[in-house]
């Protein structure tokens, strides 16, 4: 709940200073973030497009602000074969597990290291009993990417590759479940990070702009090709061990990180003033 506390205390500090020059300041708390924000992603996107700046409060593991995050997709690979008795008539079957293994080898290089795209096959299922040739098999992959165009590229390449089968009579399909989009590197976020660095230096501290390899709700707020809103992620307190029993925050980071939110709102409001 540290992000919630950070936001509420930042608002209190602004109120204590009687600062109201920000135009419109909107706060959104969504309880479904851990499950993909399926119920709130539309609201996030709609509200973001009504504002000039968006701050998201994931916790950084060091004094940093994030200017880019990865997008997350899932790839679903399904093979349909034909079952048969493995002892008396194996030749009558069409082994979906063998075909799945063939496809996984073909698809192992779908990623693109040069673009930061990774595709890792992480779940495999096939067969029901040891004495039955499996009639179906499936696999799922985790895809991470920073270039928005990579979703279409990976799916197109994958669907082309799976047309080459090994086991005659099997059918193979590949589809994609789209998850969080990336917060791609963009001038607006980069400039916002520079402003954060300048403000942080005023209290004798330094802050680093970084790119994260995992996905966050900042991707829903980002509008590709548009200067606004400028989005900045990891505005929360510094900490680590997410979801673990030993998860923690650095208490010494609370005050400076509160300062950063308040100082950014104050500075950006002045910059936007007519």
Where are the language model's segments positioned?
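Short, conserved micro-motifs enriched in small and acidic residues
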Residues: 1-5, 90-97, 248-255
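Acidic/histidine-rich catalytic neighborhood of metal-dependent amide-processing enzymes
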Residues: 1-70, 269, 273-274
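Short glycine/serine- and small hydrophobic-enriched flexible loop segments
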Residues: 8-16, 102-108, 263-266
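Short helix-capping segments at alpha-helix termini
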Residues: 17-21, 164-169, 202-203
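Midchain, well-structured core segments that form catalytic/ion-binding scaffolds
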Residues: 33-34, 41-187
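Active-site-adjacent substrate-binding region
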Residues: 98, 102-112, 120, 179-232
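Zn-dependent metallopeptidase/amidohydrolase metal-coordination segment
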Residues: 124, 205-272
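Generic hydrophobic alpha-helical scaffold/packing signal
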Residues: 142, 155, 159-162, 197, ...
């Amino acid at each position: 709940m540290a992000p919630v506390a950070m936001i509420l205390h930042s608002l209190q500090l602004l109120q204590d200073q009687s600062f109201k020059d920000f135009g419109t300041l909107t706060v959104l708390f969504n309880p479904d973030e851990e499950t993909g924000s399926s119920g709130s992603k539309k609201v996030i996107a709609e509200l973001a497009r009504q504002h000039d700046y968006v701050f998201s409060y994931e916790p950084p593991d060091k004094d940093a602000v994030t200017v880019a995050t990865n997008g997350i997709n899932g790839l679903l690979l399904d093979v349909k074969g034909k079952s048969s008795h493995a002892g008396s008539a194996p030749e009558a079957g069409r082994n979906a597990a063998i075909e799945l293994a063939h496809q996984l080898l073909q698809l192992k290089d779908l990623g693109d290291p040069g673009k930061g795209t990774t595709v890792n096959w992480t779940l495999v299922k096939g067969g029901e009993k040891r004495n039955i040739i499996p009639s179906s098999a499936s696999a799922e992959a985790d895809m991470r990417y920073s270039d928005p165009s990579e979703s279409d590229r990976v799916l197109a390449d994958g669907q082309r590759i799976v047309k080459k089968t090994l086991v005659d009579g099997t059918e193979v399909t590949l589809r994609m479940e789209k998850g969080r989009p990336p917060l791609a590197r963009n001038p607006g976020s980069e400039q916002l990070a520079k402003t954060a660095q300048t403000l942080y230096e005023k209290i004798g501290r330094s802050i680093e702009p970084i790119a994260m390899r995992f996905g966050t709700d900042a991707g829903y707020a980002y509008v590709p090709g548009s200067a606004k809103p400028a989005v900045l992620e990891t505005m929360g307190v510094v900490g680590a061990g997410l979801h673990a029993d030993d998860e923690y925050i650095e208490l010494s980071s609370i005050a400076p990180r509160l300062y950063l939110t308040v100082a950014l709102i104050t500075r950006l409001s002045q910059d936007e003033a007519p």
